[in-house]
From Swiss-Prot:
NCBIfam families: PRK13678.1-2 (NF010215), PRK13678.1-4 (NF010217), PRK13678.2-2 (NF010219), PRK13678.2-4 (NF010221). It holds the Pfam family DUF1292. InterPro entries: UPF0473 (IPR009711). This is UPF0473 protein YrzB. It comes from Bacillus subtilis (strain 168). Belongs to the UPF0473 family.
Length: 93
């Protein structure tokens, strides 16, 4: 996982792979982390899309960074606020 990447493959606890499209990535200085918001590509156009979020650490070579779960309610609040701002900006365009 790296900033600017468009698709990522998520592997669940059972080893199932799911191709997802990256909505956007951002860094947050308060938490000192990079974050990625993404959604499953297989979602139907008429279905409500579930947007997922993870923190990530890019590898030194810039490829295949590791995703981590969001750990605190404060992080979730910050991510939700960032997403709402992003979606509001998209609606204005």
């Amino acid at each position: 996982m790296e900033h600017g990447e468009k698709n990522i493959t998520i592997v669940d606890d059972q080893g199932n792979e799911q191709l997802c499209e990256v909505l956007f990535t951002f860094e947050n200085e308060e938490f000192g982390k990079s974050y990625v918001l993404y959604y499953p590509i297989e979602s139907k156009d008429d279905e409500e899309v579930e947007i997922l979020a993870s923190s990530f650490t890019p590898n030194e070579d810039g490829e295949n960074g590791e995703l981590f779960p969001i750990e605190t309610d404060e992080e979730w609040d910050m991510i939700e606020e960032t997403l709402n701002t992003f979606l509001a900006d998209e609606d204005e365009e």
